[in-house]
């Protein structure tokens, strides 16, 4: 009897020990899969090399050349080869053509022009019909399944002094927005030597100071032609690291993104109010992606996400895109100097006014351009964000079941589910789930977390996150 009891005790101890071992193995496997987003990311060597090739001296050269045209007011001369917006337009077109000539035929350049009807003051800023021209360089993607997926980066090359309809005054616009224009041109120069799955559009627009005219026309045409623009960046006032109060910050760039989509329908609004998601628009996901990628590839730079569509009561060239349902964000320096913005060039009470190149920080602009380039490259190399992502709600349960449509990229490795606390600004956790289109997060209630899904290719390139809609 004693011997039988001893054998039974040994068996019980063995079973307990085996259960503990299996539990530890399970925990190890889970922890290996369920790691923080930061730990899961690895650097792409091509992107790392690309950002080092962006040079401040090229950006400075472009800014000084644009300033040399005296004014780039949209209403200024279009047929003068030395002064006015026409001279700036033609020079930019020529520079993009030089870049395209070195791209093995993958980049094309065009002038996108239209006749803007008069919108006279006080309501408008176009006293007479005016030709508006965007200079657009398109770097075609090399993967057939992704070539029609587009990413747009822009700066506006027009400028203004105190009055937006004064076409004669000097309006150097070194920061607003030769800085953004120069960043776009430098990105095109560097990135044209690389191949991407998706297509990237480098665009310099006119008419921004006349109420976003050039960008509105481009966005309207894109919507009309059903272009698949998955993300749009505008760079506007990225030139100075010092504010008018002397505050200096050389290592921060603000990225503005809207939460509730401008294009939201009433039905979509009702759903959002029922399930949350006011901080999970496509534009907000794009901003999170930029922060994650930009800070990974540009050491020392902080991408400060601002939960606004733009600065207080102000606007930029990303707005026509978000209003038409595209994900779009704005890059801007951390602290603006209003002595050098929309001012006639003058000295008053010992203070220099005017948007002059001497107030630009060319090294800072280069750092912002590197953040842009890293994010653009990561987007164009990654698979598309999963489509029709849904959270199944047919029955009450403390599990969370997600489903999505399959991607079609040939190099797709699978998908990743991400989640965060409802009070967290960023995705904090992720789980590789393989090449499936449905997955159940056991023991994780949809009431307590926000979930999302991204696609991952065989090289580890990840798409921006898609936020799910409820499926009843």
Predicted regions, residues:
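A non-catalytic alpha/beta surface segment that caps or lines the substrate-entry region
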Residues: 35-36, 58-140
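Active-site-adjacent mobile loop/cap segments within catalytic or ligand-binding domains
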Residues: 67, 238-258, 304-383
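Alpha-helical metal-binding/catalytic segments enriched in His/Glu/Asp
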Residues: 137, 153-154, 158-212, 372
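Short S/T/G- and acidic-enriched coil/turn segments that sit immediately N-terminal to beta-strands
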Residues: 184, 434-440, 449
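Metal-dependent peptidase/peptidase-like ectodomains
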Residues: 205-316, 328
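Conserved aromatic anchor
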Residues: 398-411
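Beta-strand-rich modules
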Residues: 441-462
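Extracellular fibronectin type III
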Residues: 458-472
């Amino acid at each position: 009897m004693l011997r039988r009891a001893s054998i039974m005790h040994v068996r019980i101890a063995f079973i307990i020990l085996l259960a503990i071992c299996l539990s530890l193995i399970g925990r190890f496997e889970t922890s290996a899969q369920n790691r923080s987003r930061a730990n899961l990311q690895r650097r792409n060597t091509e992107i790392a090399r690309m950002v080092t090739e962006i040079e401040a001296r090229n950006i400075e050269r472009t800014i000084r050349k644009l300033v040399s045209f005296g004014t780039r007011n949209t209403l200024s001369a279009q047929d003068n080869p030395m002064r006015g917006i026409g001279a700036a337009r033609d020079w930019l077109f020529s520079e993009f053509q030089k870049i395209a000539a070195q791209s093995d035929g993958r980049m094309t350049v065009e002038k996108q022009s239209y006749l803007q009807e008069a919108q006279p003051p006080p309501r408008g800023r176009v006293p007479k019909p005016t030709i508006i021209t965007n200079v657009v360089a398109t770097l075609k993607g090399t993967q057939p399944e992704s070539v029609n997926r587009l990413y747009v980066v822009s700066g506006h090359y027009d400028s203004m002094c105190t009055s937006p309809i004064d076409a004669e005054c000097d309006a150097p616009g070194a920061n607003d927005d030769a800085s953004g224009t120069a960043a776009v041109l430098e990105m095109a120069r560097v990135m044209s030597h690389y191949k991407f799955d998706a297509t990237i559009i480098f665009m310099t627009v006119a008419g921004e100071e006349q109420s976003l005219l050039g960008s509105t026309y481009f966005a309207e045409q894109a919507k009309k032609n059903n272009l698949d623009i998955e993300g749009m960046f505008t760079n506007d006032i990225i030139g100075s690291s010092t504010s008018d109060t002397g505050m200096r910050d050389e290592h921060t760039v603000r990225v503005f993104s809207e939460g509730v989509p401008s294009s939201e329908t009433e039905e979509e609004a009702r759903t959002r109010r029922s399930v949350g998601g006011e901080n999970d628009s496509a534009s907000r996901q794009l901003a999170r992606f930029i922060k994650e990628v930009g800070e990974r590839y540009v050491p020392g730079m902080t991408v400060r996400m601002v939960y606004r569509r733009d600065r207080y009561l102000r606007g930029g060239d990303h707005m026509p895109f978000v209003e038409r349902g595209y994900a779009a964000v704005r890059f801007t320096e951390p602290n603006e100097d209003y002595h050098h913005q929309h001012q006639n060039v003058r000295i008053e009470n010992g203070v220099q006014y005017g948007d002059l190149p001497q107030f630009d920080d060319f090294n800072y602009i280069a750092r912002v351009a590197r953040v842009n380039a890293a994010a653009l490259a990561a987007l164009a190399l990654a698979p598309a964000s999963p489509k029709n992502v849904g959270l199944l709600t047919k029955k009450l349960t403390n599990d969370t079941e997600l489903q999505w449509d399959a991607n079609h990229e040939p190099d797709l490795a699978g998908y990743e589910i991400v989640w965060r606390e409802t009070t967290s600004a960023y995705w904090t956790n992720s789980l590789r789930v393989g090449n499936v289109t449905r997955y159940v997060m056991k023991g994780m209630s949809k009431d307590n977390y926000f979930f999302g899904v991204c696609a991952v290719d065989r090289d580890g390139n990840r798409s921006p996150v898609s936020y799910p809609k409820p499926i009843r």
